[in-house]
C-alpha cells in the first residue's frame, strides 16, 4: 500500500497537475501510475477486473455502499455527498488535501477553457446554494469556486436563500449589468433554470443581456417530475435572458468525479437534443457495449469516465448513465434502467468494495 506522503503519490499528483495545465506530460504513463496506485491501495480491484474481464470502471453504486478512499493515514480534507435522486442511499466521495487541490485546479482550468474564455470579470450569478449553506454539495462547491476565481467580486452572488430564489435580487443584478453593458454568466442546476425561467415568464420579466453573456446548467433531470428537452431549455434561456442557444452550455459532473465534461460543440445528437461532451487529456468519456463491455466508437452503451484528476480512489468510473458515442464525443442521454444492461449487473455483482 502507498501511504499518502509516499514520494510516488506526491510525484503522481505533480504529474496530474501538469497534465491539467496542458504541459507535455504523457497521459498514458499517468493512467498507468493511477492504476498502480489503485491496485496497491484497493486490493479488491484486481479481483473485480479479473471477473469483469477488463479494466472496467468501478460502478458509481460503490460509493453508496462504502467510502472508497485510498489513504487511511490521511484524514479527508472534504467529503461530498450525492443527492440520492438515483437511489435511497446517499453516496460519498472523500478528498485528501492533494485530491482537493487537483479537483480545484481541474474545475478552474476546465471553466477557463470552456466557459469563461475571453470574458474579464463578468457578473457570475449562481442558482445553487452557497458552500456555507450546502457544504456537502459538490455543485455548490464547484460553481462557487468558478465565481470567486473569475467573477466580478462586488456583483457576483448566489441568489438562492433558505426560502428559494431571491427574484428581486436577481432582477437588481441583471438590470445593473444591462445598464453597465457587463456580460453575465449564470450557473445552476438544469431543473433550477427551468423553474426560474417559468417563474420569470409568469412575472413578465425578461432581459436582453449584454453580448458575451452565457449560461451553464448541470445535473439534468434525474428524479424530477418533469423532463425537458435540452433544446427546449436553451430556447427558454434565449427567451428569458436574450442569450443565444450557442451560449447556453451544459456540463456533466458527478460527486464521484473531480472533473466535469463540457459540451464539445452545439450539435444536438441525442434523443432529447443532448450535445456531445468534450474529452481532454485528463478526462475522457467512453461508451462500453452494454453486454460485451467492449468500447464502442458509435452507438449507445454504458458511460465510463476516466478522470485522471482523481487520486484518492479509482479514476475509472462506470457511471450508470446511458451514452451515445459519436465522432464528436459522447452525449449523455439518460440513466441505465434495471435489467437493461448486463454490464451494470455484472459489475455490481462481481465484487463488494
Cite the ranges covered by each PLM segment:
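Active-site diphosphate/adenylate-binding microenvironment
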Residues: 36-81, 87-95, 103, 109-117
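Phosphate/oxyanion-binding active-site loops and adjacent basic polyanion-contact surfaces
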Residues: 99-107, 135, 166
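Conserved AMP-binding loop of ANL adenylate-forming enzymes
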Residues: 112-148
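"Short basic amphipathic alpha-helical interaction patches in structured regions
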Residues: 92-101, 139-144
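Active-site glycine/GP-rich loop and adjacent strand/helix microenvironment
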Residues: 1-37, 121-122, 136, 145-353
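Short, mixed-charge, low-aromatic patches
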Residues: 1-4, 23, 55-68, 95-100, ...
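Short acidic, glycine/Ser/Thr-rich loop/turn "cap" segments at secondary-structure junctions
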Residues: 87-97, 120-131, 154-159, 295-296
Amino acid at each position: 500500500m502507498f501511504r499518502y506522503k509516499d514520494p510516488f503519490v506526491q510525484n503522481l499528483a505533480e504529474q496530474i497537475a501538469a497534465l491539467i495545465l496542458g504541459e507535455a506530460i504523457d497521459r498514458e504513463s499517468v493512467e498507468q501510475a493511477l492504476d498502480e496506485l489503485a491496485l496497491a491501495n484497493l486490493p479488491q480491484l484486481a479481483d473485480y477486473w479479473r471477473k469483469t474481464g477488463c479494466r472496467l470502471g468501478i460502478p458509481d453504486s460503490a460509493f453508496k455502499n462504502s467510502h472508497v478512499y485510498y489513504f487511511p493515514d490521511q484524514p479527508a480534507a472534504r467529503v461530498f455527498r450525492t443527492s440520492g435522486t438515483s437511489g435511497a442511499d446517499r453516496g460519498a466521495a472523500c478528498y485528501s488535501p492533494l485530491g482537493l487541490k487537483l479537483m480545484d485546479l481541474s474545475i478552474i482550468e476546465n471553466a477557463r477553457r470552456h466557459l469563461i474564455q475571453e470574458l474579464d470579470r463578468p457578473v457570475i450569478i449562481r442558482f445553487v446554494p452557497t458552500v456555507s449553506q450546502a457544504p456537502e454539495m459538490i455543485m455548490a462547491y464547484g460553481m462557487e469556486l468558478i465565481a470567486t476565481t473569475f467573477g466580478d467580486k462586488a456583483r457576483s452572488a448566489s441568489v438562492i436563500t433558505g426560502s428559494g430564489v431571491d427574484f428581486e435580487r436577481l432582477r437588481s443584478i441583471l438590470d445593473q449589468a444591462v445598464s453597465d453593458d457587463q456580460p453575465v454568466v449564470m450557473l445552476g442546476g438544469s431543473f433550477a433554470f427551468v423553474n426560474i425561467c417559468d417563474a420569470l415568464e409568469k412575472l413578465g420579466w425578461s432581459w436582453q443581456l449584454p453580448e458575451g453573456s452565457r449560461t451553464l446548467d448541470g445535473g439534468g433531470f434525474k428524479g424530477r417530475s418533469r423532463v425537458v428537452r435540452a433544446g427546449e431549455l436553451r430556447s427558454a434561456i434565449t427567451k428569458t435572458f436574450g442569450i443565444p442557444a450557442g451560449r447556453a452550455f451544459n456540463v456533466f459532473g458527478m460527486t464521484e468525479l473531480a472533473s466535469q465534461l463540457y459540451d464539445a460543440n452545439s450539435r444536438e445528437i441525442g434523443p432529447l437534443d443532448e450535445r456531445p461532451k468534450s474529452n481532454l487529456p485528463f478526462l475522457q468519456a467512453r461508451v462500453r457495449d452494454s453486454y460485451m463491455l467492449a468500447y464502442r466508437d458509435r452507438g449507445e452503451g454504458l458511460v465510463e469516465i476516466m478522470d485522471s484528476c482523481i487520486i484518492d480512489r479509482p479514476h475509472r468510473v462506470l457511471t450508470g448513465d446511458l451514452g451515445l458515442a459519436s465522432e464528436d464525443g459522447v452525449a449523455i442521454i439518460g440513466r441505465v434502467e434495471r435489467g437493461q444492461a448486463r454490464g451494470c449487473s455484472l459489475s455490481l455483482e462481481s465484487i463488494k468494495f
